[in-house]
Amino acid sequence: MESIDVINALGNEYNPDILRAAHQPRSAKEFSEDLDVPIATCYRRIEELTKTDLLSHHDRILTDGQRRTSVYRRNFDVIEIEFEGEDVSVTLQERSPVQNKLDNVWRDLADT
């Protein structure tokens, strides 16, 4: 992942909102409804964010309509952008596996 690619992705409309909402696994439909973003735009933004490794495919879940849908989660808890002279660097503090497991347990409990 190039720093400039991450910065460009963060500068695109809706991407920061999607990343904020992706602290727990969500489907494109959930992003669209919760953030009032057109569904086609959501899919394009998800693709862009996964290409820059800011978001990843987390799972495929069964919806209420008995259809499988993909859910996505951000790959980090903290992002730092540092400018030094003409150089720029991006550091991601990745989500801990323990936090991911806790999130999964809470999501499973909420679904029951």
What does each model-found stretch correspond to?
Residues 77-112:
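Amphipathic alpha-helical dimerization/coiled-coil segments
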